[in-house]
Amino acid sequence: MQQLLVALTLVACVTDASAQDTTIGAGKVEIGGFPMGGTFFVGGDDNKEVDFNVYSAGANATYYFTDRAALEGEFSISFGLAQDVFFNRSEVLHIQMPNVWTYFANLVFFPAGSAGKRMPFYVTGGIGAVSLQSRQPTRQFGYDVDSVGFESFIAENIGGGVKIFRASAPDWGFRADYRYVIVNANGDAPAFFAKAKGRSGHRVSFGVLFTWKR
């Protein structure tokens, strides 16, 4: 009987340890990156203010205050690949765009909580900056590498998404995210983007995440 009790106790301990090892859902500190994304800037006038798209990639770190609330810092670079745009009321074919850098601090809220959830969904909003980087092909748009370099704008974002965790690899997960980016006007910027009026953009991204600390 004693041997049976000892065996059952050992099984219970192993089961409990295994359950703890396979805890899914968000932890306390999380790092991640999104190698796949796109940002679509809208609100131009097809004259001096140009609509354009960029390929986005970035990284983020998240600290969870509670099961429902977290603070996130994120950084991204978006590459202005060649595309067709309208500028000065005429179409410009296959021209590269400025690269776009973004920096945001966001508050993240999980309405249903995040701990122990396989697919916790969230809403988020934050403030930061958007910077356009001049390149040789963007000289005609006023973004001359010799005179402008970088031009920065105060910006906000709101959005939401979902994180996906699996029991087989509980510390790793995936993330799908959407942000509506609001770029404030900067009167010192070239007319190409957000000089006389604010602009906006839609960013969609897909990434991976790792729970650094539970």
Where are these regions (language model features)?
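Generic short beta-strand segments
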Residues: 36-39, 77-78, 179-181
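Short glycine/proline- and aromatic-enriched beta-strand/turn motifs that initiate or cap beta-hairpins
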Residues: 19-64, 205-214
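Cleavable N-terminal export/targeting peptides
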Residues: 1-25, 213-214
